[in-house]
Amino acid sequence: SMELLADIGKNTVDFVPNFDDTEKEPVVLPSRYPNLLVNGTTGIAVGMATNIPPHNLREVVQAVVKIIDNRVEEDRDTTIDEILPIVKAPDFPTGGLILGTRGCEEAYRTGRGKIRVRAVTNIETLPNGKSQIIATELPYMVNKANLIIKIAELVKLKKIDGITDIRDESNREGVRVVIELRKDANANVILNQLYKHTQLQDTFGVIMLALINNQPKVMNLLDMLTYYLKHQEDVVTRRTKYDLNKAEERDHILQGLLKALDFIDEVITIIRGSQNAQIAKERLMERFELSDVQAQAIVDMRLRALTGLEREKLENEHQDLVAKIAELKAILADEKLLLGVIKTEMSAIAEKYGDDRRSKIGYDELDISMEDLIPRENTIIAMTSLGYIKRMTVDNFKAQNRGGRGIKGMQTIDEDYIEDLLMTTTHHYLNFFTNMGRVYLSLIHISEPTRRS
């Protein structure tokens, strides 16, 4: 939480009056890490809502670093396709199993999507032959007590048969919900029923909506990271200007103190001989060409402290400030140095607070397409004048050299002949147009008959 407020006293963000105009509050927080993505948020307003899931700190920081590196090293913008391999899915504090990445990718590309999360369960067989289902991680925002009540209701209504007992054995070490089954019950079938009828499997609806210049906007993942980086550029720029101003003010005073040390006896004489501090300040300004700030700093010091100043200590501080001022001016003058500061600070945050991912990413049957089940191979499609279609592999054909006899590719019905012949692959789609104006789409995976059929 302190990293959200880091440097808030250095004019890094704007302040506005609070509700009763008695105090001032920040419009936004400096936030050294993308809090909106890392911790997530949920909110409902008039006509709109936002529901952003939490993410892994290391992954989000790595994504921002990727954007910075592309700008600094290659002078180009980052694409969403470069971010998706880094931030693959949300990371819920309660763990759970995220089913596939299709919903995550849709949410990250469009700003809206549905992510299916399943409880982490395992089936144990007891010595008496009975089985029990043990849930050790629940989907995000699922109330454990309500879940147990729901399962009990389903058992009572006989919508799920085979459960004999439900126990909550959770403790400080973690969640543990035990579901005991009858000896003749099929544990996998009951587990699938629980996934279907209870929140052991739940859906997280993503709406990545936030205010940009006081206007609500649904953003994809890259947009959110880019806007955060712009915010950090503004924060670090304002902080650097603040630090530069303070360093120059302090160095200006040090220069006055060093000049006073060169004439310390005369300075003390002027101060002691003056009727008040104002007269002493004016005399010092006139005699040593000091500024109002420098003279005031000398007058404000007690004589004992003034005579006890160590020149070497002041000179070392002066040299340090000169180097610091040069560094701060360089950061303000060079965008790449500014981005380097942001990268260094964010990397330190990830190193200090980052942890391993809690939510695992599993496979979802919806992520498996027909292309994944069909081997890719070159193929030839032949269609006859009577509408017969045949698929043949390219291996069935070979070039006919001069002379010799060819190979018969297919058998046709009397008075039928090949009208169209095309070469494609089994991962391409074939459109079938009917005389009724309809079109049907199918993968080119027509069953492959023998060569002479």
Place the predicted regions along the sequence by residue:
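C-terminal interaction appendages of subunits in large macromolecular complexes
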Residues: 3, 8-11, 42, 48-447, ...
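P-loop NTPase nucleotide-binding/switch module
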Residues: 4-32
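Intrinsically disordered, low-complexity linker/assembly segments
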Residues: 30, 38-39, 208
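Short glycine-rich loop/turn motifs
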Residues: 30-34, 377-380
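Short glycine/proline-enriched loop/turn "hinge" motifs that connect secondary-structure elements
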Residues: 35-37, 169
